[in-house]
């Protein structure tokens, strides 16, 4: 649902075209997007299913342009998403291109090219590390990774939180798989900010669902716009 909400935000008379990459991830996100589109009566003008590593997107671009779509939701991964975005730009299509967390990668801009990537939107159940980490945490990240910033790296915050959840359970003497699973599903844990609490189902899902963030390429960089 979030990918559709973020896609149509700010677009007058949205006309949506949905494309998947035929992978389990891509078809799953496609189905979720289509369900929301149907439920909210969003105007969907077309869809396509294009295999990964497609060399020529000209036929797909032609279909999109013929449909009158002003939004393309791509549910695959960034190498193909970037190639499709470039093909759309080269084909003079004007509209909003958006992908999920499979497309949210700084390398997407390199694949698509800065001009084609500009304005692209993304969604992911993630909050950028540089947004929530304090100075000490960011310094520790730089020391451990040799990276000046976590910007452009998805799920750093979530990895930080997950690691500390496991360490917390281990510190309590839970050192087997079964005991750690029971600890995780029964406990309540603080996240990176030291204030927000999370808990998990036995299957490891965040209770209540993880907030989904909206991102967009602005001036050649991926920016975070909060929960969508």
Segments from the language model and where they lie:
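Extracytosolic ligand-binding ectodomains
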Residues: 1-228
């Amino acid at each position: 649902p979030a990918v559709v909400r973020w896609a149509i935000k700010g677009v007058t008379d949205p006309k949506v075209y949905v494309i998947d990459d035929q992978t389990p991830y891509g078809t799953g996100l496609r189905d979720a997007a289509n369900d929301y589109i149907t439920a909210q009566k969003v105007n969907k003008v077309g869809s396509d299913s294009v295999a990964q590593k497609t060399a020529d997107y000209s036929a797909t671009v032609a279909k999109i342009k013929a449909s009158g779509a002003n939004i393309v939701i791509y549910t695959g991964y960034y190498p193909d998403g970037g190639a499709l975005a470039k093909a759309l730009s080269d084909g003079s299509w004007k509209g909003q291109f958006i992908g999920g967390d499979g497309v949210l990668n700084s390398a997407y801009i390199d694949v698509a090219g800065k001009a084609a990537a500009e304005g692209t939107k993304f969604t992911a159940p993630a909050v950028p590390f540089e947004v929530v980490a304090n100075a000490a945490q960011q310094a520790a990240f730089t020391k451990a990774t040799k990276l000046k910033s976590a910007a452009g790296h998805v799920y750093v915050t979530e990895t930080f939180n997950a690691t500390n959840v496991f360490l917390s359970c281990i510190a309590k003497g839970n050192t087997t798989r079964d005991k750690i699973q029971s600890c995780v599903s029964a406990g309540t844990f603080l996240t990176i900010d030291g204030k927000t609490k999370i808990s998990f189902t036995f299957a490891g899902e965040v209770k209540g669902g993880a907030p989904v963030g909206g991102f967009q390429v602005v001036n050649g960089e991926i920016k975070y716009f909060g929960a969508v």
